[in-house]
Amino acid sequence: MPKYRSATTTHGRNMAGARALWRATGMTDDDFGKPIIAVVNSFTQFVPGHVHLRDLGKLVAEQIEASGGVAKEFNTIAVDDGIAMGHGGMLYSLPSRELIADSVEYMVNAHCADAMVCISNCDKITPGMLMASLRLNIPVIFVSGGPMEAGKTKLLDKIIKLDLIDAMIQGANPDVSDEDSNQIERSACPTCGSCSGMFTANSMNCLTEALGLSQPGNGSLLATHADRKQLFLNAGERIVGLAKRYYEQDDTSALPRSIASKAAFENAMTLDIAMGGSTNTVLHLLAAAQEGEVDFTMADIDRLSRKVPHLCKVAPSTQKYHMEDVHRSGGVIGILGELGRSGLLNGDVHNVLGLSLPETLARYDVMVSDDAAVKSMYAAGPAGIRTTQAFSQDCRWPSLDTDRQEGCIRAREFAYSQDGGLAVLYGNIAEDGCIVKTAGVDKGSLVFRGPAKVYESQEAASEAILGGKVVAGDVVVIRYEGPKGGPGMQEMLYPTTFLKSVGLGKSCALITDGRFSGGTSGLSIGHVSPEAASGGLIGLVRDGDIIDINIAGRGIVLDVADSELAARRETELARGAAAWTPVARERQVSFALKAYASLATSADKGAVRDKAKLGG
């Protein structure tokens, strides 16, 4: 029978000092022996997805205490990728994932906490906490802040839906008036919550639900809606039960590694492909799998991408649907229901509620459930009122969207495509693979051949695009922006956005060893592995080289003779210590980022730290 971890600090005469300190935090004799639950919050006033979380940790803590546990809250950092975008701040985004994971480990292990409730929301915070959860393998429940309501405004006598990406595109479009650009900017992000499309934050929150580590509805229920409060109350109550099941009954099914098994990872990736999630999710799932010692690799993602249909198209791939529309259609469980009916899911998995996948679908899939409370929850809709307050409105859609032919979520026979919204490409330029969000690619660009325009920073590429140096038919190559080469694997949202702004969004391709925002669409291929800084062939591409891309064939090839590539490699190696670094790039890199780069692996490994360098 496992012993409560917290007993290390609460039992025995030699722990009198520790107990004295616990008493100073408010604990009493009656509390020693109860499970100590870490409430891992990520409140910050820097991030709209987290600005409303200040009081939610207290809400969870009160429920933990009422359910027989002891709650102790701490906070992690949280970087807003949108605010950090387009300047040196983006170098810190991906490395912050590792810092978050480590800080959770440090706090939980230093104080011997027994279990956790992770209150996350945005891009690197959910993955960082997920990595820590699987590393620590103690009972955990995720409950996120929830999605932002979609923005809405009236232009040319027409009401249109908006999000952050619209503000970025129109702000850089010289044909849009200052007045219209300002109106879009002011309307794009109306409430607290994670940005309203299927960007990285919402994609990851959907995936924690598919993994079984959060409750049904967590990935899609709006941050502003009163119904979301129940998810936090349930999490506080449920985590005490999970802790007692494990520590008092030796029930290992309560542990995250039992819940997030390989079968669960495959289900999560299947969902991701079906909903056309952010390409960043690939990076984060691979990293989380390594922490949980799950044998889940790029090969598994490639295999799944060839058989899973694209069932749900959401912004930025279309402006018709946002997360509030996904929720109205049944949310994550609605998509899983369609996948389950197509025989594409592993049923032998369970979630933090203790329900198997078939049980979860029977209760929460709006297409089959007869539970009025479930249907009412999925009818929770937007209010259209600017606010930074959680649970501030109780509006409901007049009806659910159960149209599986032309609605937000489609049945397999009416899929947008029979192969899904993400694909892995291989070829000489990406021997270990690269990722493209096919959900956002125009059908006319699925096969593309063009000359390379090579840049060694996203800043140089952006300047060239806006300066008219990139023309239709070009393949923009941005290298030395990988985990090691950047360092930090910046998101290339500005170059892809600027391609759209100058009318080249459907007539150019972009490939990079960096990554993309969840807001990216178009023929944007990222995570090229191995990266240039690790000797990858992308580091040998020259201006004018022809690059062939075939998404259906899952191929990406640099059309240069092997003998020429071998000669280029010798030339590069002759640079000595400067080999596999940018030729001319001015970039200030801090000691902290250099430390990150020294251990970073390429994207096909999840950009995690190289354990071999540490003897692990």
Curated annotation (Swiss-Prot):
Species of provenance? Sodalis glossinidius (strain morsitans)
Pathway assignment reads: Amino-acid biosynthesis; L-isoleucine biosynthesis; L-isoleucine from 2-oxobutanoate: step 3/4; Amino-acid biosynthesis; L-valine biosynthesis; L-valine from pyruvate: step 3/4
Q: Which GO terms describe its cellular component?
A: cytosol
Highest taxon of the source?
A: Bacteria
Return the SUPFAM superfamilies for the record: IlvD/EDD N-terminal domain-like, LeuD/IlvD-like
Gene3D superfamilies listed in its UniProt record: IlvD/EDD C-terminal domain-like (3.50.30.80)
Q: Which residues carry this modification: N6-carboxylysine?
A: K124
Question: What InterPro entries does the record tag this protein with?
Answer: Dihydro-acid_dehy_C, DihydroxyA_deHydtase, DiOHA_6PGluconate_deHydtase_CS, ILV_EDD_C, ILV_EDD_N, IlvD/EDD_N
Catalyzed reaction equations? (2R)-2,3-dihydroxy-3-methylbutanoate = 3-methyl-2-oxobutanoate + H2O; (2R,3R)-2,3-dihydroxy-3-methylpentanoate = (S)-3-methyl-2-oxopentanoate + H2O
Q: Which GO terms describe its biological process?
A: isoleucine biosynthetic process; L-valine biosynthetic process
List GO molecular-function terms, semicolon-separated: 2 iron, 2 sulfur cluster binding; dihydroxy-acid dehydratase activity; magnesium ion binding
Q: Which cofactor does it need?
A: [2Fe-2S] cluster; Mg(2+)
Quote the record's binding site residues for [2Fe-2S] cluster: C122, C195
Alphabetically sorted, this entry's keywords are:
2Fe-2S, Amino-acid biosynthesis, Branched-chain amino acid biosynthesis, Iron, Iron-sulfur, Lyase, Magnesium, Metal-binding
Membrane-spanning segments: none
EC? Answer: 4.2.1.9
Which residue positions are annotated as catalytic? Answer: S517
Q: How is the cofactor bound?
A: Binds 1 [2Fe-2S] cluster per subunit. This cluster acts as a Lewis acid cofactor.
Under NCBIfam families, the record lists:
ilvD, PRK12448.1
State its role.
Functions in the biosynthesis of branched-chain amino acids. Catalyzes the dehydration of (2R,3R)-2,3-dihydroxy-3-methylpentanoate (2,3-dihydroxy-3-methylvalerate) into 2-oxo-3-methylpentanoate (2-oxo-3-methylvalerate) and of (2R)-2,3-dihydroxy-3-methylbutanoate (2,3-dihydroxyisovalerate) into 2-oxo-3-methylbutanoate (2-oxoisovalerate), the penultimate precursor to L-isoleucine and L-valine, respectively.
What the record says about family reads: Belongs to the IlvD/Edd family.
* Protein name from the UniProt record: Dihydroxy-acid dehydratase
Self-association state and partner proteins as the record states: Homodimer.
Binding positions (Mg(2+)): D81, D123, K124, E491
